[in-house]
């Protein structure tokens, strides 16, 4: 009887019982229950969902058998390295043709005038102009094939891409030139690559080229093509030294009248020769094939395919120099999927204005720009309460990010972060950073504040652009991800720095279809970079983390020995000191005849006055830069950061000089990718460095 009673109590109610129950409720109660049910249903269908990573985040790479410790990506087919993502896109020419096809002749290249909306060239317009320009080049004594090198000396703009595609359409090779190479390097490149034709944007660059010819330094240069208008005086000056000066439109018109059938390249054909800057001696010309470039961006696509699929609706903002492969690689992804590329006006100060007008979805950045964004955001939080609220909101968003949730519609976005997102156009869904190490603090904050996927990569021109990339779903910082599916990575002992592979540390080496073919006409330096087994020795020091990701811990290339015999890697030290709140830029200098380091510090003009005021030091920016009291406060803050980061005493600077003006591309102290040009910095601050050593002895 007891069992039957229990079963009777536990039985589910009949439908008639439920109906009777609801009829007994008041109308107000029923409406309230309905509203509650609707809210619950809405939350269930719209609650934020964590991104599912494409692999086990605790094992993002694996060792390759019988390879001497090399590791590979676990994403995709691990048995062979990825050479391409699409069968119909194995060269850069095919990449663009694929974009033309799938976009339905959609908008391709965008540009704008001040305070005007973007104007667009369609894919078909770009392809036609490229064919006409290429045909026109052939009419002016250029030859079809990879023996023909064409110089492009211009800032980012649609004509740059048209010129590049013109070369690819007829299997010619692009050689980018840029201002910061300096006249001597430009002369060296023109002669080394046997360049007879250079396409430039502005007349002053044409004049620079003519000056070399007039001094009989570049006898092979015969044709200079200008994108912008020029006067007859320039044309006449060219005639006098045997150089034909033509407008780009005239060459296109000539090609339209004498159209040639395209002669597309093969994957193994040379596509571009990128000459590096910022090193001692003559620049090195890294030879990259179409297959190199396609393999590299295919690796990127493979890693991100589960969470980020590029489409025709994607918009890329182009402001990083096209002369460097980081920008070229990201743009290739966009063209391959029929997306749009909008160019900045040419003034870095108007970036935010351009982004608001363009509303990009893809935004490649260098860490220095991320640092500036981070510093500016916190500088605007100018009271203790505002700063506390900002940090509180960031921590709440960062907790979501750690759980795999990436979104821009939370309550914290509405209250704090929407304005930050709007400054980038409000539609960014992917940020890619590379070219230098990024601060974990900055990356962690911006992943939360910007509400989009932020990836970090590592590589160099010699492996096309990237060789590692962070995995979707792994939003931790302090590493550069796992190997791309297009290459293997191994570490080798760096004896002079005391890094050993037995401890999971060593010089980073890369091998795969994205690795370059060597330096143009420079066998000695090619042998230094590429060993007999095809491994590229990067000169960077890395460490494998337990999850199979790579951490950059040092740099072999810029190390030097102090007088007492200790090796020092200045870039590692600079990456620590740059986190000092008032410091915008820093150059750490050492000498093998000296026993300690000194530094050149450029304070942040927006942050330093407030920071100084908190220390009880008053004055405007110029006055503060001359203040001995402030200099000591900044040095103390830097040394404290160094101690917290585990720097040895010999790695800490003992004296600093405060410099008012920023290092820049324009003053020749930064490369176009905003890396410090160490030889130039050393020479520029020679007097100040000598004084620092004399005072500190």
From Swiss-Prot:
Ranges per topology, Cytoplasmic: 46-697
Gene3D superfamilies assigned to the protein according to its UniProt record, in alphabetical order: N-terminal domain of ligase-like
SUPFAM superfamilies, per the entry: Acetyl-CoA synthetase-like
GO function terms (MF aspect): arachidonate-CoA ligase activity; ATP binding; enzyme binding; long-chain fatty acid-CoA ligase activity; protein homodimerization activity
Required cofactor names: Mg(2+)
Pfam families: AMP-binding
Keywords carried by this UniProt record: ATP-binding, Endoplasmic reticulum, Fatty acid metabolism, Ligase, Lipid metabolism, Magnesium, Membrane, Microsome, Mitochondrion, Mitochondrion outer membrane, Nucleotide-binding, Peroxisome, Signal-anchor, Transmembrane, Transmembrane helix
Disulfide bonds listed in the record: none
Gene Ontology annotations of biological process type: cellular response to insulin stimulus; fatty acid transport; long-chain fatty acid metabolic process; long-chain fatty-acyl-CoA biosynthetic process; neuroblast proliferation; neuron development; phospholipid biosynthetic process; positive regulation of long-chain fatty acid import across plasma membrane
Membrane-spanning parts: 25-45
Expression sites by tissue: Expressed predominantly in brain and, to a much lesser extent, in heart and adrenal.
Reactions accelerated catalytically: a long-chain fatty acid + ATP + CoA = a long-chain fatty acyl-CoA + AMP + diphosphate; (5Z,8Z,11Z,14Z)-eicosatetraenoate + ATP + CoA = (5Z,8Z,11Z,14Z)-eicosatetraenoyl-CoA + AMP + diphosphate; 15-hydroxy-(5Z,8Z,11Z,13E)-eicosatetraenoate + ATP + CoA = 15-hydroxy-(5Z,8Z,11Z,13E)-eicosatetraenoyl-CoA + AMP + diphosphate; 12-hydroxy-(5Z,8Z,10E,14Z)-eicosatetraenoate + ATP + CoA = 12-hydroxy-(5Z,8Z,10E,14Z)-eicosatetraenoyl-CoA + AMP + diphosphate
EC number in record: 6.2.1.3, 6.2.1.15
UniProt entry tagged with the keyword Methyltransferase: no
Coiled-coil residue spans: none
PROSITE patterns: AMP_BINDING
GO cellular component: endoplasmic reticulum; endoplasmic reticulum membrane; membrane; mitochondrial outer membrane; peroxisomal membrane
Note: 5 rat isozymes encoded by different genes have been described. ACSL6 corresponds to isozyme 2 (ACS2).
Family: Belongs to the ATP-dependent AMP-binding enzyme family.
Main function: Catalyzes the conversion of long-chain fatty acids to their active form acyl-CoA for both synthesis of cellular lipids, and degradation via beta-oxidation. Plays an important role in fatty acid metabolism in brain and the acyl-CoAs produced may be utilized exclusively for the synthesis of the brain lipid.
Protein name as catalogued: Long-chain-fatty-acid--CoA ligase 6
């Amino acid at each position: 009887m007891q069992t039957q009673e229990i079963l009777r109590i536990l039985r589910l109610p009949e439908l008639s019982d439920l109906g009777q129950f609801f009829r007994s409720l008041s109308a107000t109660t029923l409406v309230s229950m309905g509203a509650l049910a609707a809210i619950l249903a809405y939350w269930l269908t719209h609650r934020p969902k964590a991104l599912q990573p494409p692999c086990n985040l605790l094992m993002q790479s694996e060792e390759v058998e019988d390879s001497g410790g090399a590791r590979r990506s676990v994403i995709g087919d691990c048995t062979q390295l990825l050479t391409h993502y699409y069968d119909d896109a194995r060269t850069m020419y095919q990449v663009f043709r694929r974009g033309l096809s799938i976009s339905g002749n959609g908008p391709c290249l965008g540009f704008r005038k001040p305070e005007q909306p973007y104007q667009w060239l369609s894919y078909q317009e770009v392809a036609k102009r490229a064919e006409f320009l290429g045909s026109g080049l052939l009419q002016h004594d250029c030859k079809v094939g990879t023996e023909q090198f064409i110089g492009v000396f211009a800032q980012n703009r649609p004509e740059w891409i048209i010129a590049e595609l013109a070369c690819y359409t007829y299997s010619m090779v692009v050689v980018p030139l840029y201002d910061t190479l300096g006249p001597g390097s430009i002369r060296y490149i023109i002669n080394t690559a046997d360049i007879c034709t250079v396409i430039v944007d502005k007349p002053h660059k044409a004049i620079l080229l003519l000056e070399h010819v007039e001094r009989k330094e570049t006898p092979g240069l015969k044709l200079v093509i200008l994108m912008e208008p020029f006067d007859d005086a320039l044309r006449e000056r060219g005639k006098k030294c045997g150089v034909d000066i033509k407008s780009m439109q005239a060459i296109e018109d000539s090609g339209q009248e004498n159209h040639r059938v395209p002669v597309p390249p093969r994957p193994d054909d040379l596509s571009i020769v990128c000459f590096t800057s910022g090193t001692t001696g003559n620049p090195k010309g890294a030879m990259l094939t179409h297959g190199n470039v396609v393999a590299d961006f295919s690796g990127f696509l493979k890693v991100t395919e589960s969470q980020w699929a590029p489409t025709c609706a994607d918009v890329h903002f182009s402001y990083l120099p096209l002369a460097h492969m980081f920008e070229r690689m990201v743009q290739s992804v966009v063209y391959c999927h029929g997306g749009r590329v909008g160019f900045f006006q040419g003034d870095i100060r108007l970036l935010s204005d351009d982004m608001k007008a363009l509303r990009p979805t893809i935004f490649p950045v260098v860490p220095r720009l991320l640092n500036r964004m981070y510093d500016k955001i916190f500088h605007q939080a100018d009271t203790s309460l505002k700063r506390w609220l900002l940090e509180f909101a960031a921590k709440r968003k960062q907790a979501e990010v750690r759980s795999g949730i990436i979104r821009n519609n939370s309550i914290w976005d509405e209250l704090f972060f929407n304005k930050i997102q709007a400054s980038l156009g409000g539609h960014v869904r992917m940020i890619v950073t590379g070219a230098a190490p990024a601060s974990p603090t900055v990356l962690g904050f911006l992943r939360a504040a910007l509400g989009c996927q932020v990836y970090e990569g590592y590589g160099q021109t010699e492996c096309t652009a990237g060789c590692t990339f962070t995995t979707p779903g792994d939003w931790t910082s302090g590493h550069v991800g796992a190997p791309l599916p297009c290459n293997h990575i191994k570490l080798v002992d760096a004896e002079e720095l005391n890094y050993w592979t037995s401890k999971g540390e060593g010089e980073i080496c890369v091998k795969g279809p994205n690795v370059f073919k060597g330096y143009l006409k420079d066998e000695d330096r090619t042998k230094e970079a590429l060993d007999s087994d095809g491994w590229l020795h990067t000169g960077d020091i890395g460490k494998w983390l337990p999850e199979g990701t790579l951490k950059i811990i040092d740099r072999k290339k810029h190390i030097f020995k102090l007088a007492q015999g200790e090796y020092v890697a200045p870039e590692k030290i600079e990456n620590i000191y740059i986190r000092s709140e008032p410091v915008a830029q820093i150059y750490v200098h050492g000498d093998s005849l000296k026993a300690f380091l000194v530094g050149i510090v450029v304070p942040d003009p927006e942050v330093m006055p407030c920071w100084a005021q908190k220390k009880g030091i008053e004055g405007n920016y110029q006055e503060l830069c001359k203040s001995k009291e402030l200099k000591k406060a900044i040095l103390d803050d830097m040394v404290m950061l160094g101690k917290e980061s585990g720097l040895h005493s010999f790695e800490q600077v003992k004296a600093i000089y405060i410099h008012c003006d920023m290092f820049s591309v324009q003053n020749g102290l930064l490369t176009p990718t905003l890396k410090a040009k160490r030889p130039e910095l050393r020479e520029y601050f020679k007097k100040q460095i000598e004084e620092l050593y004399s005072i500190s002895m």
